[in-house]
């Protein structure tokens, strides 16, 4: 490092001064070098990399460079060795003119990370400019009448150098008449005078030629010369005389044009025209002075004619000449020194350089974003500039050196909150009033993948009908990513899983860009009711971020499966039933049962049975249960009936459109003691050949009659034992009876008129036993029912046996096989009833709907673990949405079912006891009912109709 040295210091003082200077440089972070002006290209200035502590290997990767705007081409750094060298000719007089000190300020910048270094290079002046006079000669007119020691001003030379190189000494060629008088003024300028040493005689010497030489103080010395041409004038021997040799004027730089600066006063002792004085600027005055000032030739007033600028010129030296009108004219000179005072008329200048944009939103704090340079052409407090940044932004200004600031990151950034910051930087000077300037810096925040795609909700529910076409669009998922560009590009994919034994990708797919979900194959409700899977959304950032959303795809059932007939319980083919019916059976006797199942669900699987009308419109003595599929007699068969009936039962579901299947049932009526030959041949929807009857084995009929007689006797004995016990209210075993009541119209009530008890003589109370009372005709009103209390009594005055009809639900019927017998399943058949009779029923896990049931079976939306009261067509009352039917019963409810604790000695009312036995007990009860019906037929001619109504 080269430092300028100052002479006159001792070794100790010099060493101390050097140490202090080095400490100041380390603290300030600025390097100082010095070079002479006019240095050649490649001249060594300093080892910048070494002095800054930078490795040579990192200069090129970090783009180490000179960033100065004004003097960038003068100096350059060699990136191979880190040396600062002269790049082009440096003329000190060009950037610094006549300044005492001349320095070149450089900014050295290194990237990754961004660093700024300041270098000050002092340019030493060399004596490369000789003194220069304005012209090659100066003409001086001197009257011959001038006295000895008279002085005549002459113009000196100017030297573009500074310091000792600009200190001029003048010498005059030898002359008998004149000598050179040099006068140093307090303005560091010299005034030259020719002093008359010998009287002039124009006639003797009209002209004199002298040579004035100016020599500077440089080494080597340089000289400049000018020829002085002295013309001796005659007569007018008194020159004008100024009252002051020097006039001093102070002007503000904002002084208006036309302002009077001063008035010169000069007098001439001569008379007449020789005493008239004319003022004018000296002929050697500069053009700049002539453009800014004007002197009145007669009055001597000097006025300002152009705007002053302190920053351009701080002072002016004006030479004014006063010339009389004599012949030859005589003149005198004075000096007007104009000092310009600074006014705060220049706003600060602000420059933003080295923008490091865009800045990543995860950039660390104190990251340098831009360099800001401020300046003010004013001086003093008017030129002191402070820089500030708009508030409430995540940035701040850090002052590095005088008039240099760095824009750095002060707090964390979030591009999703604000992607571009429009910053306003203000530079304000210290004047009064102060002036300021603003600059806008647009800081763009670069996105970082810090946001995962987000769905509007975590789960979606989709309903799709089955049998959809392949490639059907079923849903569209959409996720939003708050990032930008590729970080916000969302792609969708399935989260693979297994659905049963098949991969999820066999069922659905998702479009990677649009998020549309497609069904790849037709969905089957019977195979998959619910398809639950996840769709993943991932962005294209590095590293990628993602999130999942759950889709629940419910496959809605369509009526795409027709009812299928089940094979008979014993032998036979599907859709063909052949039955033998004795002619002695009464109304309501179950002849056969048509069984069918539907693979659909809900209403699409709810089956109903219809008996097709006979050919020719003939009436047939049979009917089929609307929902049970049981074919029963509608009246007592007689001899007038045909011996064979071919019944067509239409089974259809409740889908849209409804699908059907037809079953053929061949019913043969046989007389007692005959052995009909039975064969069943039928097909679905097509009648086959009529089955031939075969003789009935005599032994089989005898066995049946014997068993029937035994059952009748057992039932009579049992009834007699029950009737022998006197009726007692609540005569059930304490803690065991369960009371279930029903009204005559099929709605549940606690009526005293229609109350029955169901008790069990042993074992725990059975809450699943129920007693039904026969329904009355809906045409009977309350008064009619009160007037006929005996309508519910048999011939002996005892209450009639209830007629419960337990059925399997459709969901259980679908799994029944041909080998399953309804009797073996513990089903108690219904008693006789008319074709229009409808019964309120209770559906549970085991019973199936009766003909009067109008709600779908289990599997069609009804909970299979509840008992629900149903109304048939005879009782059209329907409950509104969200409410229960009147007198609705739920097993175990304390309002309907009560368990009474009777005394130990209480009697059981056996007449009210009903139980559900096995197959033999069922047959006994059937035969007993048939006997009762026969007796009633004899006593009443229309008993069949009455029993049907009951």
Swiss-Prot record:
<feature type="repeat" description="PXXP 3">
    <location>
        <begin position="832"/>
        <end position="835"/>
    </location>
</feature>
<feature type="repeat" description="PXXP 2">
    <location>
        <begin position="799"/>
        <end position="802"/>
    </location>
</feature>
<dbReference type="InterPro" id="IPR050174">
    <property type="entry name" value="Protocadherin/Cadherin-CA"/>
</dbReference>
<keyword id="KW-0812">Transmembrane</keyword>
<keyword id="KW-0106">Calcium</keyword>
<protein>
    <recommendedName>
        <fullName>Protocadherin alpha-1</fullName>
    </recommendedName>
</protein>
<dbReference type="GO" id="GO:0005886">
    <property type="term" value="C:plasma membrane"/>
</dbReference>
<feature type="region of interest" description="5 X 4 AA repeats of P-X-X-P">
    <location>
        <begin position="734"/>
        <end position="894"/>
    </location>
</feature>
<feature type="domain" description="Cadherin 5">
    <location>
        <begin position="456"/>
        <end position="565"/>
    </location>
</feature>
<feature type="repeat" description="PXXP 4">
    <location>
        <begin position="873"/>
        <end position="876"/>
    </location>
</feature>
<dbReference type="GO" id="GO:0007399">
    <property type="term" value="P:nervous system development"/>
</dbReference>
<feature type="repeat" description="PXXP 5">
    <location>
        <begin position="891"/>
        <end position="894"/>
    </location>
</feature>
<feature type="domain" description="Cadherin 1">
    <location>
        <begin position="30"/>
        <end position="133"/>
    </location>
</feature>
<feature type="domain" description="Cadherin 6">
    <location>
        <begin position="588"/>
        <end position="678"/>
    </location>
</feature>
<dbReference type="InterPro" id="IPR013164">
    <property type="entry name" value="Cadherin_N"/>
</dbReference>
<dbReference type="GO" id="GO:0007155">
    <property type="term" value="P:cell adhesion"/>
</dbReference>
<feature type="signal peptide">
    <location>
        <begin position="1"/>
        <end position="29"/>
    </location>
</feature>
<feature type="region of interest" description="Disordered">
    <location>
        <begin position="827"/>
        <end position="889"/>
    </location>
</feature>
<feature type="domain" description="Cadherin 2">
    <location>
        <begin position="157"/>
        <end position="242"/>
    </location>
</feature>
<dbReference type="Pfam" id="PF08266">
    <property type="entry name" value="Cadherin_2"/>
</dbReference>
<keyword id="KW-0325">Glycoprotein</keyword>
<feature type="domain" description="Cadherin 4">
    <location>
        <begin position="351"/>
        <end position="455"/>
    </location>
</feature>
<dbReference type="InterPro" id="IPR031904">
    <property type="entry name" value="Cadherin_CBD"/>
</dbReference>
<keyword id="KW-0732">Signal</keyword>
<dbReference type="InterPro" id="IPR015919">
    <property type="entry name" value="Cadherin-like_sf"/>
</dbReference>
<feature type="glycosylation site" description="N-linked (GlcNAc...) asparagine">
    <location>
        <position position="257"/>
    </location>
</feature>
<dbReference type="InterPro" id="IPR002126">
    <property type="entry name" value="Cadherin-like_dom"/>
</dbReference>
<feature type="glycosylation site" description="N-linked (GlcNAc...) asparagine">
    <location>
        <position position="265"/>
    </location>
</feature>
<dbReference type="GO" id="GO:0007156">
    <property type="term" value="P:homophilic cell adhesion via plasma membrane adhesion molecules"/>
</dbReference>
<keyword id="KW-1003">Cell membrane</keyword>
<dbReference type="GO" id="GO:0005509">
    <property type="term" value="F:calcium ion binding"/>
</dbReference>
<dbReference type="Pfam" id="PF00028">
    <property type="entry name" value="Cadherin"/>
</dbReference>
<keyword id="KW-1133">Transmembrane helix</keyword>
<feature type="glycosylation site" description="N-linked (GlcNAc...) asparagine">
    <location>
        <position position="548"/>
    </location>
</feature>
<feature type="topological domain" description="Extracellular">
    <location>
        <begin position="30"/>
        <end position="697"/>
    </location>
</feature>
<feature type="topological domain" description="Cytoplasmic">
    <location>
        <begin position="719"/>
        <end position="950"/>
    </location>
</feature>
<dbReference type="Pfam" id="PF15974">
    <property type="entry name" value="Cadherin_tail"/>
</dbReference>
<feature type="region of interest" description="Disordered">
    <location>
        <begin position="901"/>
        <end position="950"/>
    </location>
</feature>
<feature type="domain" description="Cadherin 3">
    <location>
        <begin position="243"/>
        <end position="350"/>
    </location>
</feature>
<comment type="function">
    <text>Potential calcium-dependent cell-adhesion protein. May be involved in the establishment and maintenance of specific neuronal connections in the brain.</text>
</comment>
<feature type="transmembrane region" description="Helical">
    <location>
        <begin position="698"/>
        <end position="718"/>
    </location>
</feature>
<keyword id="KW-0472">Membrane</keyword>
